[in-house]
Amino acid sequence: MDLKDITIKADGKWYYGNAEMFRRNILNILASHIERDENGAYLIRLGDDVNPITVEDVPFLATGYQETDDGIKLRFHDLQELLLDHELKLTLKGDVPYISYKWEADTRLSRGIYWKLSDYFDFRGDEIYIVPPDVKKG
């Protein structure tokens, strides 16, 4: 498999050539190895093998939400998870919401997740922060 033929579409779906990649366990492995180069381009590094990939918008899409004893957990399309045990800045590009996972504004929130998190919005001037329960406001 030549990884340079991988594209992450704006809707968060992964493609190899024209075929959608739907095996989440494989997506999880690939997504957990995404890096950025000095020019901001995305690549997947597996051992010594480094392959550029095409990302139409951002590499991550939050699609799942779970309240746990440890806090709120977001699950991504690729099965990665982010525990919201700290406040996060919400970035709006037009009407599309983003949060930062590995890099600034690299994760798009699905509409449903955005609305679930809206209970925890803290408006600070022109900025919006997500402050989960039991987290002190900064």
Feature names for model-found ranges:
Residues M1-G138:
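Terminal leader/tail segments of proteins
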